[in-house]
């Protein structure tokens, strides 16, 4: 018996040691469909030690320099801090996949959609819409009809046109056709059709020339046909006309059956005529298409090198969570939801702080404020809210349309949860699927803190929550469903400014972040220092 015990003791000790090491080891930093994070969800007792705060830093794959600056400034200070180092877990949030399409070949720099132009129609005029030969041209009941489109490669519109009634002899109508740039109230140009001035007949349309402008890539416009008579227009559903996109240089934007119309739509969605256009800079387009295969190969090689660098970086620092998304701006909300899932499934924590890799963060100040203000309750959202109660838009340096605050709104704390922020229908912050003209209140993305129960709710509903154009506005829309207690705090700065006692400040270069932290360490104030020759 003793012999058996002697043999068993090493096995028991080995198993105990293995279990102890397993419990102490950090969870794998990977948030993907059926990866280790999902396996850990089955064994919550194997989570790593408890943290007061988990910090998630949104970071792009190629932002190595910004991450290294953070590691050498506030993160280094945190790791060396005698008490905070054991209370905080910091992870960079990075998409596991790079976009396989080079930036030059994407529809826009914010997504990963291929600019799919093939066999472009060059050096000739193109009719945007045409009717099949066997289509009758009866009058509808609609007196105002509009269609929206997006330009994917520069074009010039030369003429606007209207369908005509085959039963009429000549042109017997009074119709106005206008082209608007999206979100603009004044038409770029107008064509007026009447019996004495009906233009030129081409196929089943009457056309009139207009002043010629180059419509650049990413231009979004709406053509509106309006009958000046009591009769409706000769119009067709978009599915009953042929769209001639010139090989892919433009795309018609439709709301889709059963969906709400876009805000800039007028009247009924459809086509009551057309326009003639030519493709601009055709030779440059052909050259670009010719060089695309070589560019795709080079880009694929660059992605492999980037993957290798990221694997090495993660191995060295062990502070990256790779989430299972393609790393583009449009996918940032999905990155955040995946990180919430990873956090819930692999860690034990009280609060979660979200920030970006171009932000100055003062974690000591964050902890001091948590203790001083008792900011640790349930269903809790601590950030910066800009309160606005009217709809007068203003343009910020960032180019985003905001809403001017009224005097009454400024009676709150130094604010910056953004409220009544206008929804952009074009550009980087374009949002076509949120029907309201303004977003619910949302916090500045430079930094905010949410309670554990909110993180659990977001993680549990990650598969159902719709993502919108930005992670900040998406967060506001998601939070509108649960109505958290908001603590408004202007020390989470929304713009690139420096204030004493600030908790965060965004949009800095690596060199600027280094300077801020050097001032902070030397004088206790990142904004100014008597011994330094200037500050921010």
Where does each model-flagged region fall?
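C-terminal catalytic/acceptor-binding lobe
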Residues: 4-6, 10-18, 280-291, 408, ...
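Extracellular and analogous surface-interaction loops
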Residues: 146-156, 167, 210-217, 451
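A short beta-strand element within beta-rich, extracytoplasmic domains
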Residues: 155-168, 222-225
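PGST-rich, cysteine-poor low-complexity/disordered linker and tail segments that act as flexible spacers
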Residues: 145-147, 239-302
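Aromatic- and Gly/Pro-enriched, solvent-exposed loop/edge beta-strand patches characteristic
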Residues: 98, 108-123, 169-256
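N-terminal signal-anchor transmembrane helix specifying type II single-pass membrane topology
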Residues: 1-39, 61-64, 70
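Conserved catalytic core of nucleotide-sugar-dependent glycosyltransferases
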Residues: 100, 117-138, 312, 329-333, ...
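Active-site-proximal specificity loops/subdomain of glycosyltransferases
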Residues: 86, 91-122, 289-350, 424
């Amino acid at each position: 018996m003793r012999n058996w015990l002697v043999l068993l003791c090493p096995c028991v000790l080995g198993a105990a040691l293995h279990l102890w090491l397993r419990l102490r080891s950090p969870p794998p930093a990977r948030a993907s469909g059926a990866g280790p994070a999902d396996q850990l969800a089955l064994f919550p007792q194997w989570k790593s030690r408890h943290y007061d705060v988990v910090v998630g830093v949104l970071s792009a794959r190629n932002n190595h320099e910004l991450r290294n600056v953070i590691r050498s400034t506030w993160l280094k200070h945190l790791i060396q801090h005698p008490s905070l180092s054991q209370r905080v877990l910091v992870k960079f949030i990075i998409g596991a996949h790079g976009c396989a399409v080079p930036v030059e070949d994407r529809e826009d720099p914010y997504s990963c959609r291929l600019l799919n132009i093939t066999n472009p129609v060059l050096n000739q005029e193109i009719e945007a819409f045409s009717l099949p030969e066997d289509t009758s041209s009866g009058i509808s009941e609609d007196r105002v009809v509009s269609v929206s489109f997006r330009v994917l490669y520069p074009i010039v519109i030369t003429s606007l046109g209207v369908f005509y009634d085959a039963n009429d002899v000549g042109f017997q109508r009074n119709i106005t056709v206008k082209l608007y740039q999206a979100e603009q109230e004044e038409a770029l140009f107008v064509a007026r059709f009447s019996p004495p001035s009906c233009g030129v007949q081409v196929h089943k349309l009457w056309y009139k020339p207009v002043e010629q402008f180059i419509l650049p890539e990413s231009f979004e416009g709406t053509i509106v046909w309006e009958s000046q008579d009591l009769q409706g227009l000769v119009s067709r559903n978009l599915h009953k006309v042929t769209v001639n996109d010139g090989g892919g240089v433009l795309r018609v934007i439709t709301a889709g059956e059963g969906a709400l119309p876009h805000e800039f739509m007028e009247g009924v969605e459809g086509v009551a005529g057309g326009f003639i256009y030519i493709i601009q800079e055709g030779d440059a387009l052909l050259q670009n298409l010719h060089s695309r295969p070589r560019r795709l190969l080079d880009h694929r090689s660059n992605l492999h090198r980037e993957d290798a660098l990221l694997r090495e970086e993660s191995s060295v620092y062990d502070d990256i969570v790779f989430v299972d998304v393609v790393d583009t701006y449009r996918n940032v909300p999905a990155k955040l939801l995946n990180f919430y899932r990873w956090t819930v499934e692999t860690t034990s924590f009280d609060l979660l702080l979200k920030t970006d890799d171009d932000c100055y963060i003062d974690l000591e100040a964050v902890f001091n404020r948590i203790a001083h203000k008792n900011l640790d309750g349930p269903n809790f959202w601590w950030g910066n809210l800009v309160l606005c109660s009217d709809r007068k838009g203003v343009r910020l340096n960032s180019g985003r349309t905001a809403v001017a605050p009224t005097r009454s709104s400024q009676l709150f704390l130094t604010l910056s949860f953004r409220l009544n922020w206008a929804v952009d229908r074009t550009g980087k912050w374009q949002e076509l699927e949120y029907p309201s003209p303004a977003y619910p209140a949302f916090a500045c993305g430079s930094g905010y803190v949410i309670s554990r129960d909110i993180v659990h709710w977001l993680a549990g509903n990650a598969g159902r929550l719709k993502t919108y154009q930005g992670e900040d506005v998406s967060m506001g829309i998601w939070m509108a469903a649960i109505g958290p207690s908001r603590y408004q705090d202007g020390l989470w700065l929304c713009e690139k400014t420096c204030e004493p006692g600030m908790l965060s400040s965004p949009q800095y270069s690596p060199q600027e972040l280094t300077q801020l932290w050097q001032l902070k360490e030397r004088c206790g104030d990142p904004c100014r220092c008597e011994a330094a020759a200037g500050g921010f």
